[in-house]
UniProtKB/Swiss-Prot annotation:
Stored InterPro entries: ATPase_NBD (IPR043129), Gcp-like_dom (IPR000905), KAE1/TsaD (IPR017861), TsaD (IPR022450)
GO MF term set: iron ion binding; N(6)-L-threonylcarbamoyladenine synthase activity
One cellular component (GO) term of this entry: cytoplasm
Keyword Transferase annotated: yes
Uppermost EC category: transferase
Subcellular location: Cytoplasm
Protein name (record): tRNA N6-adenosine threonylcarbamoyltransferase
Role: Required for the formation of a threonylcarbamoyl group on adenosine at position 37 (t(6)A37) in tRNAs that read codons beginning with adenine. Is involved in the transfer of the threonylcarbamoyl moiety of threonylcarbamoyl-AMP (TC-AMP) to the N6 group of A37, together with TsaE and TsaB. TsaD likely plays a direct catalytic role in this reaction.
Taxonomic placement: Bacteria, Pseudomonadati, Pseudomonadota, Gammaproteobacteria, Thiotrichales
Binding site for Fe cation: 112, 116, 304
Length: 336
């Protein structure tokens, strides 16, 4: 069973074909709009939508050619329906349903976060079994779930303000780095020369619940930097180090609490921040010390991509989910 997946929720146009029968990714293509939006310091929704329109047909032809298949080979077309930029979502959904109508192929709506939650399954070497705890950590979301079976997700905790990835990007902006700055913060942190120069707070780390807060940490970075008389490259690196240590410490602590609270031994990490080296290193230590199994997506599938939508769509279609009409029903915000 071959499923075409279409991701267009923000500033990446991603398409992929997933084979549900063999549980393998057949092919995928991705176009990133980062360079387009960089000069504006963030994503411009109207530009994002127009760029999706310009690229979707081109990328579809490229994907089918790379996979050496045609539309007649497809069982289903999956597309991101929520959450995301409403215009961008409408472009992807309309494109998917049009293809489905023309070629008489079923379509299925996919929740973007479900795609991220299942993305570690793209690593064929991972033997992930239910149930497990999942941390979804990205620029738009920081949430902990208990996943009992496919489609059975219980929210354990989430950020009450900024997402972790958002805090990384805003810290980068405060320190004069270009968009998107999360990776730059992480890279500069590795060049710190005085790792004890700054001591930043770890909001809600010791709270008994599983919620997060990163707004206060971001404000602490702002106040620390603006009061610093020596705003040198070295001190910028030192502050990036302190910020990253604080943010990752909170994430790892909450993950451990979630595992203890639910009694699970398996932890899945997904979303853009799951590519962070320090996060992976700290969780690897946790795994070795406490005997937990921890799973990540392949590095190239941490950020938004079509592969995770094709995979999630394949699982949904196999579980009898599909669109019943041609209505375009997309949502900017939606819980999983």
């Amino acid at each position: 069973m071959l499923v075409l997946g279409i991701e267009s929720s923000c500033d990446e146009t991603g398409l992929a074909i997933y084979d549900y029968t063999s549980k393998t990714l057949v092919a995928d293509v991705l176009y990133s709009q980062i360079d387009l939006h960089k000069k504006y310091g963030g994503v411009v929704p109207e530009l994002a939508s127009r760029e999706h329109i310009a690229k979707l047909n081109i990328l579809t032809k490229e994907l089918l050619s790379n996979a050496n298949i045609n539309f007649n080979d497809l069982s289903c077309i999956a597309y991101t329906a929520m959450p995301g930029l409403i215009g961008a979502l409408m472009v992807g959904a309309t494109f998917a349903k049009t293809l489905g109508l023309i070629h008489n192929i079923d379509t299925v709506a996919v929740h973007h976060l479900e795609g991220h939650l299942l993305s570690p399954l793209l690593d064929q070497s991972s033997d992930i079994k239910y149930p497990f705890v999942a941390l979804l950590v990205s620029g738009g979301h920081t949430q902990l779930f208990e996943v009992r079976e496919f489609g059975e997700y219980s929210l354990l905790g989430e950020s009450i303000d900024d997402a972790a990835g958002e805090a990384f990007d805003k810290t980068a902006k405060l320190l004069g780095m270009s968009y998107p700055g999360g990776v730059e913060v992480a890279n500069l942190a590795e060049k710190a020369t005085d790792k004890k120069k700054y001591d930043l707070p770890r909001p809600m780390k010791n709270k008994p619940n599983l919620d997060f807060s990163f707004s206060g940490l971001k404000t602490a970075v702002l106040n620390t930097w603006y009061s610093e008389t020596d705003q040198s490259y070295e001190n910028k690196a030192n502050l990036c180090y302190a910020f990253q240590e604080a943010a990752i410490d909170v994430l790892v602590t909450k993950c451990e609490k979630a595992l203890q609270k639910t009694g699970n031994k398996r932890l899945v990490i997904s979303g853009g921040v799951s590519a962070n080296k320090l996060l992976r290193s700290k969780l690897d230590i946790l795994s070795k010390n406490k005997g937990y199994e921890i799973f990540f997506p392949p590095m190239k599938y941490c950020t938004d991509n079509g592969a995770m939508i094709a995979l999630a769509g394949a699982y949904r279609y196999a579980n009898s989910f599909r669109d019943s009409n041609l209505e375009i029903n997309v949502k900017a915000r939606a819980q999983i």
